[in-house]
Amino acid sequence: MPPKPGPDREVTDEQILTAIRNAYSPAVGTSDVAERVGAQRQTVDKHLRELAEEGLVETRMIGRVRVWWLSDDGRRYIDDYA
């Protein structure tokens, strides 16, 4: 089990986009992304909402869970970054 993320854990947009791209499913929940990057869920949620405003990820609610996936622009961005 990975170590519990600390409150000061810095995470980059690129780490989040890469975590979504490398996920087992095309759409992932906020907690899944947070676990993959080793950051707190609230921190990742803030980043994801900003990325959605920039058009790099898309989101929707499925039941009570918000899921995220890369937009076409997000795929191009992270492919160019990698």
Show where each model-derived region lies.
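Glycine-centered, phosphate/nucleic-acid-interacting loop/turn motifs that mediate DNA/RNA or nucleotide
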Residues: G55
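Short helix-capping/hinge SLiMs at alpha-helix to coil transitions
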Residues: R21-S25
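A short acidic, leucine-rich amphipathic alpha-helix
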Residues: D32-A34
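Short, hydrophobic-biased segments on the C-terminal half of alpha helices
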Residues: L48-R49
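Short alpha-helical segments that sit at the start of domains
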Residues: M1-L17, Y81
